[in-house]
A protein has these predicted regions:
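Helix-boundary and loop/linker segments of multi-pass membrane transporters
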Residues: 2-8, 39-46, 76
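Short, charged juxtamembrane terminal tails flanking transmembrane helices
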Residues: 2-3, 128-140
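Juxtamembrane helix-break-helix junctions at the cytosolic face
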Residues: 3-5, 64-83, 128
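Interfacial segments of alpha-helical transmembrane regions
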Residues: 4-20, 80-88
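Core segments of alpha-helical transmembrane spans in multipass integral membrane proteins
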Residues: 17, 21-33, 43-74, 86-93
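Membrane-embedded alpha-helical segments of multi-pass membrane proteins
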Residues: 64, 108-117
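Membrane-helix boundary connector in multi-pass membrane proteins
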Residues: 78, 85, 89-111, 124-132
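Alpha-helical transmembrane segments and their membrane-interface exit regions
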Residues: 115-125
Length: 140
């Protein structure tokens, strides 16, 4: 494996770790406060449940994106570069949306750093090498 590929995998792993940390903070630290605030608000009760669900789904979304990026980066597949870049793009869109609707805060700073790590890691990934022909003699 090339040094470039090793660096790419490290960057993708770091980006995924940031997404895991973001999901943990979002789901474990922020959700209880949001849930309490929703209960105390005058928001229609029919909207409180869906908002709680969406809040938790966002954390799950980051976990799923991180897992897909890790699997793609550490598996020799033809699509790994595209998959990691797509994961980075997905987080970039979420970062832009949080900036537009909420403004600058720790959450979108974490998402932004995960985006950069995933995108740079994805760009550095080599395309998967072709599997060696089973009939060809080995070079050992």
């Amino acid at each position: 494996m090339s040094g470039r590929n090793k660096a790419a995998r490290i960057l993708v792993a770091l980006g995924s770790a940031v997404l895991f940390a973001s999901a943990a903070l979002h789901s474990l630290a922020a959700y209880p406060r949001v849930s309490t605030a929703l209960g105390a608000s005058n928001l229609n009760a029919r909207l409180q449940g869906p908002l709680r669900a969406v809040f938790l789904m966002v954390g799950w979304d980051w976990i799923a994106i991180a897992i897909v990026a890790l699997l793609a980066a550490f598996t020799e597949t033809k699509l790994r570069k595209i998959l990691v870049l797509f994961c980075g793009l997905a987080v970039l869109v979420e970062t832009a949306l949080t900036l537009a609707f909420i403004g600058v805060f720790l959450g979108n700073e974490m998402l932004g750093s995960a985006t950069v790590l995933l995108m740079v890691g994805g760009l550095l990934l080599d395309t998967a090498s072709k599997p060696q022909d089973a009939d060809a003699p080995s070079e050992e």
